[in-house]
């Protein structure tokens, strides 16, 4: 027997079905601020069912599309006849857990070995994978970024791992009164009624910041480490190129990737986008704030 739990992340409702006796609150603590009332199945973006008695399929077929080691763990993505299959293990020697999803990530089955001490982290990663692909067809994107809010707007800082996204966000909080952290790793951005909004999610990297809040986007900035600080506004294709890295989409899937690109084109048109060469200091934070929050980006 299973129990259904419902969550609302970024305005998208989804359900997670867990075996009776598995406590969602303790297994997925970062999801607690996003719990919501049950809705009809057709109102859910997707549904994930975690098997009560996990059994690995006897035949593990599929074409390998990607392998990576990141904050999700060790992951392998396969294309199969009816969708996608994902293998996840928390460490190199941990048990391999499996996720099977349809081609549009509206339904998925999770094979999680509950005796694994990392089962909660693995299931959290599985939900993140499904969510990041499911939202693409609804004008939304899961983005690797750190986000702060100030005076009713939110500002996203993007960049390669180790660039200093979290550090730059912390500098805003330290030197710009009224700034608060919204999410430190994986917010969701969506277009609503012609306006770009960004929302907190249950996925915030190493920083436990799980806020069920959303703000209009005041700007999106890609950071690059440099000896001198320079703020360079970007528009059109240059803005698109800055935003694309760090967005979650299966590049080999023409429909999902096409939806991503379509939304990015809108973002590039609707919000200020810039490249910030910077050091991790007050000058960089102050300049970025001045140019974005005060709307001083040149045409």
Predicted regions and their residues:
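A noncatalytic interaction/capping subdomain that flanks phosphate/NTP-handling catalytic cores
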Residues: 1-156, 161, 171-180, 188-299
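Conserved glycine(s) of the Walker
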Residues: 164
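Hydrophobic positions on the alpha1 helix immediately C-terminal to the Walker A/P-loop
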Residues: 168
């Amino acid at each position: 027997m299973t129990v259904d739990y419902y969550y609302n992340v970024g305005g998208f409702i989804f359900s997670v079905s867990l075996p009776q006796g598995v406590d969602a609150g303790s297994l997925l603590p970062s999801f607690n601020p996003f719990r919501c009332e049950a809705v009809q199945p057709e109102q859910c973006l997707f549904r994930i069912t975690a098997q009560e008695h996990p059994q690995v399929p006897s035949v593990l077929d599929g074409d390998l599309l990607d392998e990576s080691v990141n904050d999700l763990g060790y992951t392998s993505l396969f294309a199969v006849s009816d969708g996608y299959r994902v293998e996840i293990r928390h460490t190199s020697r941990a048990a391999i857990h499996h996720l099977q999803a349809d081609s549009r990530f509206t339904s998925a089955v999770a094979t999680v070995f509950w005796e694994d001490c990392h089962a909660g982290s693995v299931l959290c990663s599985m939900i993140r994978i499904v969510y990041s692909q499911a939202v693409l067809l609804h004008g939304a994107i899961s983005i690797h970024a750190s986000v702060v809010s100030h005076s009713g707007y939110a500002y996203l800082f993007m960049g390669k791992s180790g660039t200093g996204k979290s550090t730059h966000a912390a500098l805003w909080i330290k030197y710009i009164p009224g700034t608060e952290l919204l999410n430190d790793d994986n917010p969701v951005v969506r277009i609503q009624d012609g306006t770009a909004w960004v929302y907190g999610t249950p996925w915030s990297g190493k920083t436990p910041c799980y806020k069920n809040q959303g703000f209009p986007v005041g700007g999106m900035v890609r950071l690059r480490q440099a000896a001198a600080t320079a703020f360079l506004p970007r528009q059109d294709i240059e803005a698109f190129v800055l935003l694309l890295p760090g967005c979650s989409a299966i590049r080999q899937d023409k429909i999902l990737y096409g939806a991503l690109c379509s939304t990015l084109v809108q973002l590039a048109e609707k919000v200020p986008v810039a490249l910030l060469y910077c050091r991790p200091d007050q000058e960089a934070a102050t300049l970025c704030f001045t140019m974005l929050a005060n709307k001083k980006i040149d045409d």
